């Protein structure tokens, strides 16, 4: 990892993955001028998918949600560079990769101070090729028992790494075209000791499946859930 730091800006990046000028790489206009924008997705803002020299990436600007987000859309209280949303997510992704959890590779993170007390943030991460989230897949087809085992195993691996995914839901678990399981979107996630929190984390995921089953009619049932939890239970967590 390399760092570029001034009084107003902090950038950390992986030079093996980002060969473009780091200061320019967080601008969608830069990628547009290079004709390197390959897609986009809408959430709290626009996530731009761009083609770098080394890999395809997702460029995301951090934005708040909810009512408070309407008042303060994209700035946060500054309490140190390492505690900014982007740098924290960059570090957490590297931690997960070191523990063999399938997550997007962090490419670069930036935080820019706004005066003394606030900052804005952006992150570039690997774009997982030919992937869909579980909601999209289950809206069209069922998954095999083995895939549900694999989903449970990847969640267990994340928990064993001591990481609580605070927004663990069926939109944030994706499969690529080889049916490899990936977990995404680690903004505001953090490390925790012990295992007491893991059951609540699984319960959150279970609620998301039930919600999407009622909302979109996804092809999910309780047998699927038991298959997912089986690997976790064998390894010492009782799950839902």
Swiss-Prot record:
This protein's UniProt keywords: ATP-binding, Cell inner membrane, Cell membrane, Kinase, Lipopolysaccharide biosynthesis, Membrane, Nucleotide-binding, Transferase
Annotated catalytic residues: 167
Pfam families assigned: Kdo
Subcellular location: Cell inner membrane
Enzyme class, broadest EC rank: transferase
Entry-linked InterPro entries: KDO_kinase, Kinase-like_dom_sf, Prot_kinase_dom
Reaction(s) this enzyme catalyzes, per UniProt: an alpha-Kdo-(2->6)-lipid IVA + ATP = a 4-O-phospho-alpha-Kdo-(2->6)-lipid IVA + ADP + H(+)
Annotated GO biological process: lipopolysaccharide core region biosynthetic process
Pathway: Bacterial outer membrane biogenesis; LPS core biosynthesis
One Gene Ontology CC term in the entry: plasma membrane
Molecular function, one GO term: protein kinase activity
Protein's UniProt keywords contain Ubl conjugation: no
Keyword Membrane: yes
UniProt membrane topology term: Peripheral membrane protein
Annotated EC: 2.7.1.166
Family affiliation: Belongs to the protein kinase superfamily. KdkA/RfaP family.
HAMAP family recorded: KDO_kinase
Annotated function: Catalyzes the ATP-dependent phosphorylation of the 3-deoxy-D-manno-octulosonic acid (Kdo) residue in Kdo-lipid IV(A) at the 4-OH position.
Protein name per the record: 3-deoxy-D-manno-octulosonic acid kinase
């Amino acid at each position: 990892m390399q760092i570029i730091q001034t009084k107003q800006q902090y950038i950390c990046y992986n030079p093996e993955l980002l060969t473009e000028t780091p200061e320019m790489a967080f601008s969608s206009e830069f990628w547009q001028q290079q004709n390197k924008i390959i897609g986009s997705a809408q959430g709290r803002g626009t996530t731009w998918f761009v083609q770098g020299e080394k890999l395809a990436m997702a460029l995301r600007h951090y934005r708040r949600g909810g009512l408070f987000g309407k008042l303060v859309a994209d700035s946060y209280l500054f309490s140190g560079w390492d505690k900014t949303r982007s740098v924290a997510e960059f570090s957490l992704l590297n931690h997960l990769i070191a523990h063999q959890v399938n997550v997007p590779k962090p490419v670069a993170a930036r935080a820019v101070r706004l005066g003394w007390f606030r900052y804005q943030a952006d992150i570039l991460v690997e774009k997982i090729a030919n992937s869909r989230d579980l909601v999209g897949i289950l809206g069209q087809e069922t998954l095999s028992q083995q895939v549900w085992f694999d989903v449970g195993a990847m969640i267990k691996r994340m928990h064993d790494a001591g990481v609580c995914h605070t927004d663990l839901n069926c939109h944030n678990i994706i499969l690529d075209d080889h049916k490899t399981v990936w977990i995404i979107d680690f903004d505001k996630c953090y490390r925790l000791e012990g295992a007491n929190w893991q059951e609540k984390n699984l319960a959150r995921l279970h609620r998301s499946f039930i919600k999407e089953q009622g909302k979109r009619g996804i092809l999910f049932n309780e047998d699927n859930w038991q298959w997912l939890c089986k690997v976790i239970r064998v390894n010492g967590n009782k799950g839902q």
